[in-house]
Amino acid sequence: ARALCRPAVCRPRPLPPLPPTAMEEEVAALVIDNGSGMCKAGFAGDDAPRAVFPSIVGRPRHQGVMVGMGQKDSYVGDEAQSKRGILTLKYPIEHGIVTNWDDMEKIWHHTFYNELRVAPEEHPVLLTEAPLNPKANREKMTQIMFETFNIPSNYVAPVDSIQAEEWYFGKIGRKDAERQLLSPGNARGAFLVRESETTKGAYSLSIRDWDEARGDHVKHYKIRKLDTGGYYITTRAQFNSVQELVQHYVEVNDGLCHLLTAACTTMKPQTMGLAKDAWEISRSSITLQRRLGTGCFGDVWLGMWNGSTKVAVKTLKPGTMSPKASLEEAQIMKLLRHDKLVQLYAVVPEEPIYIVTEFMCHGSLLEFLKDQEGQDLTLPQLVDMAAQVAEGMAYMERMDYIHRDLRAANILVGERLVCKIADFGLARLIEDNEYNPRQGAKFPIKWTAPEAALFGRFTIKSDVWSFGILLTELISKGRVPYPGMNNREVLEQVEHGYHMPCPPGCPASLYEAMEQTWRLDPEERPTFEYLQSFLEDYFNGPQQN
């Protein structure tokens, strides 16, 4: 279990407010694909829908049949499907065209508040529509979005928009594309299309390939846009749309490394956080199922939210954190939304306080490294996991936010070796006087930069120091840092410039990067942006030798 702690001396300065531009950049547009059978919804730029459910509305056939079951006037989506024997089901969309606006409004309400759990007035919305949708329907959709849900802006796109294609992964980077395509469940010829990182309005096609020399790997092709509106990879084969281009290469490789065989599989996405007015939830909405671990300030449980969403729940012991502080932290953490940060969903602010987050199936990186699966990890896999942590920290660096307790125990591992940073920001709110850099075993001295341990000067550069220690945990597969030394010895030695020796099996160039993070002058340490780039490109250049 991961300890939630804070230093009790030299309290760090309060978190500065986020700049307006940074906050504005994080307001993602919502995409809702209103299909005849299924509704798909999510955030623009995500690699998969956040919610997929049947486009149905059900009502009780007979009054009184559902007494004691929390009877409602109507049920939507999966809940309606599960009660189909005692409900009358209706489909408000036929052939992509809305035929029942009252029921359609219920589906959109369910999409915003139950599936995506967002405040619609905070997000622009992109709705897809059938090609033959009448103009009156388009106007009605827009009217409901503005008048009922108060959305700030609305755009209706044809249902054949690239956004609706299962192979379109939106705004993901080259490295993430490789991660996804090389994960289990994909074979040679698996592919995805993503936004170009370098050319606005263009796309990239990423394909999984294999050869004897390189084994499994990914090749990338730029999809260029013609001035006339068409698309091409090579000028001899031009197409009116990206969909037509993809279909062509499904039928013939025509110069590509392989035929396009299947869209890249995606992990089932975790639902993003709750609406701004729903961070405070009722304890009765959470069911604790299994204790995952115990720490000095409480337990971590596998739980269910509203009986349908798998979550991780931190139960804090009374006196650990004030209810007011827990809600303040929830509001701050809502602004920090990134694929490599564990998403906070909600809090139960009455003691014992519950902190509800997304669930990561493999638990902490530290425990995972000690298991057999972790012991079998290769150097490229370990470096990729480090790159993911650096990516999350580079985002926090851009947002002027500090972690304060970065170590393998506070990194969580999910499916396909996805790593996410947990417990960011919680350390500074814990009300416990024993968590002291000069005394008490709870303080993680071995991970803490000397200026933070001795004087409480926590900055993003002290996080960089901690990241260097985390790298040794990764390479050594869970070994405690500074083996054979106690906290006092570590502090004394580090203050005089001592560095841990190179871990067994660690390339010299990677150890060099570790040593850069341990420079005594914080300003001489590298940025997380640099560390992310270094680690992502580690096996593309000569530095690994």
Swiss-Prot record:
Alphabetical UniProt keywords: ATP-binding, Kinase, Nucleotide-binding, Oncogene, Phosphoprotein, SH2 domain, Transferase, Tyrosine-protein kinase
**What's a Gene Ontology MF term here?**
non-membrane spanning protein tyrosine kinase activity
- UniProt KW Magnesium keyword: no
The further comment given in this record reads: This protein is synthesized as a Gag-Fgr polyprotein.
The record's annotation in InterPro entries points to: Actin, Actin/actin-like_CS, Actin_CS, ATPase_NBD, Fgr_SH2, Kinase-like_dom_sf, Non-receptor_tyrosine_kinases, Prot_kinase_dom
Q: What class of enzyme is it?
A: transferase
Tell me the ranges covered by the SH2 domain, including all copies.
Answer: 167-264
Record protein name field? Tyrosine-protein kinase transforming protein Fgr
Please state every residue range assigned to the domain named Protein kinase. Answer: 286-539
Where's the active site on this chain? D405
Family membership, please give it: Belongs to the protein kinase superfamily. Tyr protein kinase family. SRC subfamily.
Q: What is its EC number?
A: 2.7.10.2
SMART domains tied to this protein: ACTIN, SH2, TyrKc
Return the Pfam families for the record. Actin, PK_Tyr_Ser-Thr, SH2
Q: Which reaction does it catalyse?
A: L-tyrosyl-[protein] + ATP = O-phospho-L-tyrosyl-[protein] + ADP + H(+)
Q: Tell me the residue numbers annotated for binding ATP.
A: L292, G293, T294, G295, C296, F297, G298, D299, V300, K314
Which residue positions does Phosphotyrosine occur at? Y435
Species of the source: Feline sarcoma virus (strain Gardner-Rasheed)
Domain of life assignment:
Viruses
Start and end residues of each stretch annotated as Actin = 23-157
